[in-house]
């Protein structure tokens, strides 16, 4: 890889309102130990030595981001996001210049570790098409009926929980996202856009504590994970 192809830009779609949290402010601005979720996530990305810069997609009426201590960080850029995650990611990709790798990470996953980022970056040698962090399914899986009863047990062999970051060549991801959205495809993450285009992303085994904060109980759990991580660092 040449220098420009080796450049890594982190993309953080943070334009959502997080309605499932039942909070008055977007979930990325809720606090864990006196820091917002978004602050914790951005700190993790900005301090990784192999990430050149971070682009954050914000809601057009966001009133909270400028209050973050790192909002003016020299490696941090912002764009106006869209109504859906894919629209926000595409806005960030349009902001990028040149040939690089796009590492897309959920704003509500503050428990990511530098070690997992290292593993994902290293996977480019094995998966030049791109890869995602993922965790093998360990629990018994059930498919349900519409009435809330069990329909059947699903074989968990070769099933993975998709996590983030997800790392792809930026130009390839941008092109596939644009085409998929134009065709009305249901794009739930970056890997699904690549799959839609016939690309099979690599799977990189990630830590199960890299949770996405979606419900109120997740705040406490994330705080425990982050506290344990800090204890281990000391």
From Swiss-Prot:
GO MF: 2-C-methyl-D-erythritol 4-phosphate cytidylyltransferase activity
Organism domain of life: Bacteria
GO biological process, alphabetically ordered: isopentenyl diphosphate biosynthetic process, methylerythritol 4-phosphate pathway
Keyword line: Isoprene biosynthesis, Nucleotidyltransferase, Transferase
Residues annotated as site: Positions MEP for the nucleophilic attack: 156, 212
Pathway: Isoprenoid biosynthesis; isopentenyl diphosphate biosynthesis via DXP pathway; isopentenyl diphosphate from 1-deoxy-D-xylulose 5-phosphate: step 2/6
Statement: the UniProt record of this protein carries the keyword Repressor: no
UniProt xrefs under CDD domains: CDP-ME_synthetase (cd02516)
Gene3D superfamilies according to UniProt: Spore Coat Polysaccharide Biosynthesis Protein SpsA, Chain A
Stored InterPro entries: IspD, IspD/TarI, IspD/TarI_cytidylyltransf_bact, Nucleotide-diphossugar_trans
Listed NCBIfam families: ispD
UniProt xrefs under PANTHER family: 2-C-METHYL-D-ERYTHRITOL 4-PHOSPHATE CYTIDYLYLTRANSFERASE, CHLOROPLASTIC
Family, similarity comment: Belongs to the IspD/TarI cytidylyltransferase family. IspD subfamily.
Name of the featured protein: 2-C-methyl-D-erythritol 4-phosphate cytidylyltransferase
Organism for this UniProt entry: Shewanella sediminis (strain HAW-EB3)
Annotated gene: ispD
């Amino acid at each position: 890889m040449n220098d420009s192809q080796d450049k890594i830009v982190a993309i953080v779609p943070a334009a959502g309102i997080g309605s499932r949290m039942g909070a008055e402010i977007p979930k990325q601005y809720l606090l864990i130990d006196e820091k917002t979720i978004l602050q914790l996530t951005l700190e993790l990305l900005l301090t990784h030595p192999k990430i050149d810069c971070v682009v954050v997609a914000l809601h057009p009426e966001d009133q909270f981001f400028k209050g973050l201590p790192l909002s003016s960080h020299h490696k941090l850029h912002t764009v106006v996001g869209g109504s859906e995650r894919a629209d926000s990611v595409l806005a960030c990709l349009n902001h990028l210049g040149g040939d690089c790798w796009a590492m897309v990470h959920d704003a509500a996953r503050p428990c990511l570790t530098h070690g997992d980022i290292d593993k994902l970056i290293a996977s480019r040698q094995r998966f030049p098409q791109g890869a995602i962090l993922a965790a093998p399914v360990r629990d018994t899986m059930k498919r349900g009926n519409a009435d809330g009863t069990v329909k059947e047990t699903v074989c968990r062999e070769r099933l993975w929980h998709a996590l983030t970051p997800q790392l792809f060549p930026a130009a390839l991801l941008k092109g596939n996202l644009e085409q998929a959205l134009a065709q009305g495809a249901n794009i739930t993450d970056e890997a699904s856009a690549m799959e839609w285009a016939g690309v099979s992303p690599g799977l990189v085994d990630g830590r199960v504590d890299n949770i996405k904060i979606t419900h109120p109980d997740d705040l406490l759990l994330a705080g425990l994970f982050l506290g344990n991580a800090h204890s281990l660092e000391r």
